[in-house]
Amino acid sequence: MQQYKIRISELAEQDLENAGDYIAFKLLNPIAAENMVKGIREQINKLEVFLASYELDDDSILAELGIHKTYYKEYKIFYTIDDNVKKIFIVRILHIRIT
């Protein structure tokens, strides 16, 4: 079975950077920020292998658009899958209070 390649949108990268900055500088916890960013990246990398484990988003509009979801702690990771080219595209990474 061929693994899927993962691409992360600029917006999702910015989401991740903003979340890390908030934890590091606003909450004054750089170690927690580093662990959170690392954990989210590890969760994203799991998608390459465990792609079928994750479902479409609960929101019917997002589901109709083919937006899938996975979680890392309080963060929801939104992504699409292109089976034709074996790619996963990370669209957004948002704190669950925002979604």
Regions found by a protein language model. Give the residues of each.
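Enriched for short, Lys/Arg-rich terminal
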Residues: 27, 70-99
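Secondary-structure transition/hinge residues
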Residues: 24-27, 48, 52-55, 98
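A short, surface-exposed loop/turn module that caps and links secondary-structure elements
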Residues: 44-70
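Exposed loop/turn and edge beta-strand positions of beta-sandwich/beta-sheet ligand-binding modules
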Residues: 2, 66, 73
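Arg/Lys-rich, positively charged N-terminal/basic patches that mediate binding to nucleic acids
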Residues: 1-39
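Short alpha-helical
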Residues: 14, 42, 85
